[in-house]
Design a protein with these regions (language model features):
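Metal-centered catalytic cores of metalloenzymes
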Residues: 2-8, 21-87, 91-154
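Hydrophobic helical h-region of N-terminal Sec-dependent signal peptides
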Residues: 11-20
């Protein structure tokens, strides 16, 4: 009887270990796309409060930026309540302004800003991206240095 309880406990422990190992594999798989290229993606929320210095605005935005192996960049952000004049991905930690890395393309609806085809990060820019030191900035006539900002957090 005692041996049977020990045997069942050992089997239960092995099954639990196998389930945890498989769950870990599923999490790792989410970092790969269907062509087995590594993908880092950032969902981004744009607000005036993130600007440096912060601005008061009713405008907002959100989007998703993806960086694949080879450092190619894709994605877009959609804004509301703003007539944007330009939008970029900039280098800079939260609370700091930085240089333009990639200029975004404005759609015909005037509210969607997309990463242009073929855009890539340099190795140094990719390192900054992985550290959370890139951000999206949407400029307007009222706020030439930026009205909406959102930090990219891979």
């Amino acid at each position: 009887m005692k041996l049977s309880i020990i045997f069942r406990s050992a089997i239960s422990a092995m099954v639990a270990s196998a389930v945890l190992a498989l769950a870990g594999c599923a999490t790792m798989e989410s970092a790969w796309d269907s062509t087995k290229n590594f993908v880092a993606a950032s969902n981004v929320k744009l607000t005036g409060a993130e600007e440096v210095p912060p601005v008061t605005t009713a405008a907002s935005g959100s989007g998703r930026i993806t960086v694949k192996e080879g450092m190619s960049v894709s994605g877009s952000v959609k804004t509301t309540g703003i007539v944007g004049t330009a939008a970029h991905i900039h280098a800079g930690a939260a609370g700091k302004n930085g240089a333009v890395v990639i200029a975004l393309t404005k759609s015909s609806d005037g509210n969607t800003w997309s990463v242009p085809d073929g855009a890539k990060l340099t190795a140094a820019q990719y390192k900054e991206y992985k550290a959370g030191n890139l951000y999206i900035n949407v400029h307007s006539a009222a706020h030439k240095s930026g009205e909406l900002r959102g930090q990219l957090k891979p």
